[in-house]
Curated annotation (Swiss-Prot):
<dbReference type="GO" id="GO:0006355">
    <property type="term" value="P:regulation of DNA-templated transcription"/>
</dbReference>
<dbReference type="GO" id="GO:0005634">
    <property type="term" value="C:nucleus"/>
</dbReference>
<feature type="region of interest" description="Disordered">
    <location>
        <begin position="94"/>
        <end position="152"/>
    </location>
</feature>
<dbReference type="InterPro" id="IPR015300">
    <property type="entry name" value="DNA-bd_pseudobarrel_sf"/>
</dbReference>
<keyword id="KW-0238">DNA-binding</keyword>
<keyword id="KW-0805">Transcription regulation</keyword>
<dbReference type="Pfam" id="PF02362">
    <property type="entry name" value="B3"/>
</dbReference>
<dbReference type="GO" id="GO:0009725">
    <property type="term" value="P:response to hormone"/>
</dbReference>
<feature type="compositionally biased region" description="Low complexity">
    <location>
        <begin position="200"/>
        <end position="232"/>
    </location>
</feature>
<feature type="compositionally biased region" description="Pro residues">
    <location>
        <begin position="100"/>
        <end position="109"/>
    </location>
</feature>
<dbReference type="InterPro" id="IPR003340">
    <property type="entry name" value="B3_DNA-bd"/>
</dbReference>
<dbReference type="InterPro" id="IPR044835">
    <property type="entry name" value="ARF_plant"/>
</dbReference>
<dbReference type="GO" id="GO:0003677">
    <property type="term" value="F:DNA binding"/>
</dbReference>
<feature type="region of interest" description="Disordered">
    <location>
        <begin position="191"/>
        <end position="232"/>
    </location>
</feature>
<keyword id="KW-0539">Nucleus</keyword>
<protein>
    <recommendedName>
        <fullName>B3 domain-containing protein Os07g0183700</fullName>
    </recommendedName>
</protein>
<feature type="DNA-binding region" description="TF-B3">
    <location>
        <begin position="336"/>
        <end position="434"/>
    </location>
</feature>
Length: 524
């Protein structure tokens, strides 16, 4: 005999509050508003357990708690570092109101119908121009004859100077972005003043009187690298440095080559920006030394010694041949693989090895259920011990990975780089995400800019990131980008440097709306 409906309801298994999402919401509302919890619980229970009656609860509104009682804390910001004002010739505060140099002759503009397709997803083939964002400068043609240009502001050479092309998101918006790759607005600068002769400098008591002329003396740069980025005893070869660099991003100049130094790109690596604007110009320099080492954060570090030269010093601008010293034979067979770190990799004591041939060529071959001890050196020479195991079709590092992760401050988005030489020696390094600035001091950037303006030798430290953030760029790469022909109305877009096998990242889009002339934007 079937039971009455009331008995059937009584024999139903009751759900716990954690199994019933509606009960979970009622408990949360009860904690927020205790004065209304009883009414809300009664009405909700009647609605849920009654199959024959539908009760409509009286409407009421839950008001949020006062913002004064909230526990949110303000986000700490990096303190701005006070920087000494730049001289008038650098376009600092003293030169903001200075008249700009007379505009040069008209710049040959491209055809008005030439546009840039922003929907193209094919990776670009030309080299990336470094700086803050690593945007591409130049023109390219695809198979269909369309013209592609990716810029964030460009200086185009003319007969008596350099003309700057700016672009905005709409015709009503005028954005004056510095060349050099999204570096901020350009201030009108006075023509550059030549440095005083040695005799005049000695009479005035200038400390630069004892500095030999660039390229004709043995002056040693006094700019010191950051204390946190000291070169270790471990030998970091050129191919190891390139393995740690992002594809199409990392680039090392050779000794004797000509490069452009971008001050704003250098300042982009600092934890805080200088209060005073840096000069809206770049410096032509000659590379005198390149030293490779390891940073304290297990990143590949390059210390580049530069000597500024004048644009009209043709004898000193002769390009030197490439480094004659060949790479060691053991480093020529270097193999490597890169693994982007996931949330599990940085929070648990295990590192999931990717299932590809590159990882198999670096790590030793193991069988299922094997547990092999590994010893791998970082770039500073410290040895780390791991257990390399294969469980349930998954290869991983255990027993030691968490110690390495905490010691290097790994976060989601960083990349772990594993390398192996021909003699079986293994190394590992870290390639940081581009959102984490390198802890360089602002004082280093300011000192480098001052020395570049006085044409004194100086040093810069370059800690590579995932994007084209280099600020010491070969001269031919910059000159190729400056030969692009732009005209008002031409569509442009941002393109970020990408890794091999991935589509390029297309950023904001806009169009060229004006061409402004700055005859003193490039010089030394």
């Amino acid at each position: 005999m079937p039971l009455p409906s009331c008995r059937r309801r009584e024999q139903r298994p009751r759900q716990s509050c954690f199994q019933n999402p509606e009960c979970h919401l009622r408990l949360r509302a009860r904690q927020q508003r205790p004065q209304e919890s009883a009414v809300q619980s009664t009405l909700s229970s009647s609605i849920y357990f009654s199959d024959h009656f539908v009760l409509t609860p009286p409407p009421f509104q839950i008001t949020p708690t006062s913002i004064q009682n909230s526990t949110w804390l303000p986000i700490p910001t990096s303190p701005a570092v006070a920087a000494p004002p730049l001289p008038r010739c650098l376009g600092g505060v003293d030169g903001e109101g200075a008249p700009c140099a007379p505009p040069p002759s008209p710049i040959p503009a491209g055809p008005a119908s030439s546009t840039v397709s922003a929907a193209s997803s094919a990776p670009a083939t030309r080299d990336y121009l470094g700086g803050i964002t690593g945007h591409r400068l130049g023109q390219e043609d695809d198979s269909g004859g369309h013209e592609y240009t990716s810029v964030s502001g460009i200086h185009v050479p003319s007969s008596s100077g350099v003309a700057f092309v700016s672009f905005g998101q709409c015709p009503q918006e005028v954005i004056s972005t510095d060349l050099c790759l999204g570096l901020g607005p350009i201030a009108a600068t006075a023509p550059l003043q030549p440095p005083p002769p040695p005799a005049a400098a000695a009479a005035a008591g200038s400390p630069s009187a004892t500095t030999p002329e660039p390229g004709h003396g043995e002056a040693t740069p006094t700019t010191s690298s950051s204390a946190q980025f000291q070169t270790q005893a471990q030998q970091v070869t050129r191919d190891m440095w390139m393995a740690c660099a992002a594809p199409k991003s990392g680039r090392l100049p050779t000794v004797g080559s000509l490069v452009y130094y971008f001050p704003d790109g250098h300042a982009e690596q600092c934890l805080s920006r200088p209060q005073e604007p840096l000069p809206g110009r770049i410096f032509l320099c000659k590379v005198t030394d390149v030293r490779l080492g390891a940073a304290a954060t297990n990143e590949a570090l390059a210390t580049i010694s530069l000597v500024p030269i004048a644009a009209d010093d043709h004898a000193f601008q002769l390009q030197a041949p490439a480094d004659p010293d060949p790479a060691p034979a053991q480093s020529q067979s270097l193999v490597s693989f890169v693994k982007p770190l996931t949330y599990t990799d940085v929070t648990k004591n295990r590192f999931m090895v990717p299932k590809d041939d590159a990882a198999a060529g670096v790590l030793p071959h193991i069988q299922l259920n094997d547990d092999v001890p590994l010893r791998i050196k970082d770039l500073s020479g410290k040895e780390w011990a791991f257990n390399y195991t294969w469980k349930a079709h998954t290869r991983m590092f255990r027993n030691g990975w968490m110690e390495f992760s905490n010691a290097n401050g790994l976060v989601t988005g960083d990349n772990a780089v594993f390398m192996r030489r021909g003699n079986g020696e293994m190394f590992m390094a870290v390639r940081r995400t581009r959102n984490r600035p390198a802890p360089f001091s602002v004082e280093e950037v300011i000192e480098a800019v001052w020395r570049a303006a006085r044409r004194e030798p100086f040093e810069v430290s370059y800690c590579l990131r995932q994007d084209g953030d280099e600020f010491v760029v070969p001269r031919d790469i910059v000159d190729d980008g400056l030969r692009a022909r732009f005209a008002p109305g031409m569509a442009v877009n941002f393109v970020w440097a990408v890794e091999d096998g991935k589509l390029p990242t297309i950023g904001p889009q806009g169009e060229v709306i004006s061409i402004e002339n700055y005859a003193t934007s490039i010089g030394a």
